[in-house]
Amino acid sequence: MTDYITIAIPKGRILEESVTLFGKIGINCDELLSNTRKLIFENHEQRMRYMIVRATDVPTYVEYGCADLGIVGKDTLMEQEKDLYEPLDLKFGYCRMMVAEPAGLALDDDPSSWTNIRIATKYPNVTEKYFARKGVQVEIIKLYGSIELAPLVGLSERIVDLVSTGETLRQNGLVEVETIAEITTRLIVNRASLKTKHPRITEIIEGLEKHV
């Protein structure tokens, strides 16, 4: 089955949009949306295999060659910095990676005057590099969810997190202060697979490119 193309995709909205996008280039993977606990799906007719994995694990499966292609948010790629080929911005799943703080603090706060701050985030690597470029010393507290809670209980003054509509921030009394990056979903490719399966992978990339 070495001639199969294996794609790693995370669950959730990215999975739904990916299935729709692949359908536009004749790759039928509707089975991925079925109510099942299966993690591997195979389409023998099209010689395709799909792996359902955690979003943060997609780059690892692709880097080690367990998957030829992967679909994942740019935020994960920025944080992990894997050695991967990233040929295509799929242009869905848009959000912003932001620095946010309590609205009361923001009233007379000047980010350009920051010298030593504490930040809670799921993205310690991105956060550290961002503030290092600005010459700001930062103490980073790594969290895995509900980042907005940190300023409310005094764990940190500020957070770095993804923001879509901003509604969650507003409901928790936080405001956006700085934008670190704009985030969308990306197609990633294992570098060895790009050489050994070049015709098929190139066909997929070029097909998707026409629909994004």
UniProtKB/Swiss-Prot annotation:
InterPro entries documented for this protein:
ATP_PRibTrfase_cat, ATP_PRibTrfase_CS, ATP_PRibTrfase_HisG, ATP_PRibTrfase_HisG_short
State any single GO MF term.
ATP binding
Q: Which Gene3D superfamilies match?
A: Periplasmic binding protein-like II
Q: Which GO terms describe its biological process?
A: L-histidine biosynthetic process
In terms of one coarse class, where is the protein primarily found?
A: cytoplasm
Cell location: Cytoplasm
Annotated catalysed reactions: 1-(5-phospho-beta-D-ribosyl)-ATP + diphosphate = 5-phospho-alpha-D-ribose 1-diphosphate + ATP
The EC number of this protein is 2.4.2.17
Enzyme superclass (EC) = transferase
Instruction: Name the UniProt key words of this record, in alphabetical order.
Output: Amino-acid biosynthesis, ATP-binding, Cytoplasm, Glycosyltransferase, Histidine biosynthesis, Nucleotide-binding, Transferase
Can you list the GO cellular component terms from the UniProt entry? cytoplasm
A family per Pfam: HisG
Q: Does the keyword Ligase apply?
A: no
Per the similarity annotation, which family is this?
A: Belongs to the ATP phosphoribosyltransferase family. Short subfamily.
Name-wise, this protein is ATP phosphoribosyltransferase 2
**What species was this sequence derived from?**
Geobacter sulfurreducens (strain ATCC 51573 / DSM 12127 / PCA)
